[in-house]
């Protein structure tokens, strides 16, 4: 029996992965691929109300259910404030998921004009370097999310 691929999708915000590659996610799930979605930030205080975050997380969970994704996590960093954290902290959080999940492939956001997308792109590139813990990764690819910042 062939080993199933394990794919990690890193999303700066809830919905970026679905807007950027929802069809691909559904196709991969239907083919038996194991998918893990890591969402780094969300609509959290101080810029948003806590209720806004709860709504977007529930929407993300519903989208994952439709797509067939059962493995996911939310890091709960406030949106547009990712760049306020020390780079090593973000790198470490993403690296931990890479080491724990041990993906074969990783999909990351294209580094467009949105600062959160650029920071997550950079941190994901650090986390997926070919070192011992992540050496089984055979592909790192970008997905694009059209947004108001394009």
Q: Which role fits each region the language model picked out?
A:
Residues 1-10, 27, 31, 51-54, ...:
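Metal-dependent de-N-acetylase/amidase catalytic core
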Residues 5-51:
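ATP-dependent adenylation/pyrophosphate-handling site
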Residues 38, 73-74:
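Short beta-strand segments at enzyme active-site cores
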Residues 41-43, 78, 146:
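Short beta-to-alpha linker loops that shape the active-site pocket of alpha/beta-hydrolase fold enzymes
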Residues 57:
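Short, structured active-site "lid" loops
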Residues 60-63:
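Conserved SAM-binding loop
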């Amino acid at each position: 029996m062939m080993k199933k691929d394990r794919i990690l999708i890193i999303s700066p915000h809830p919905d970026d992965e679905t807007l950027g590659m929802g069809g691909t996610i559904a196709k991969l799930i239907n083919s038996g691929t194991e998918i893990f979605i890591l969402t780094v930030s969300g609509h959290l205080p101080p810029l948003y109300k806590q209720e806004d975050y709860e709504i977007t997380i529930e929407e993300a969970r519903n989208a994952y259910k439709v797509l067939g994704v059962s493995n996911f996590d939310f890091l709960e960093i406030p949106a547009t404030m990712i760049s306020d954290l020390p780079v090593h902290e973000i790198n470490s959080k993403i690296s931990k998921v890479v080491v724990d999940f041990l993906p074969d492939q990783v999909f990351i956001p294209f580094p467009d004009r949105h600062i959160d997308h650029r920071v997550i792109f950079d941190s994901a590139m650090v986390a997926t370097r070919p070192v011992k813990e992540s050496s089984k990764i055979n592909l790192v690819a970008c997905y694009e999310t059209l947004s108001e910042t394009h």
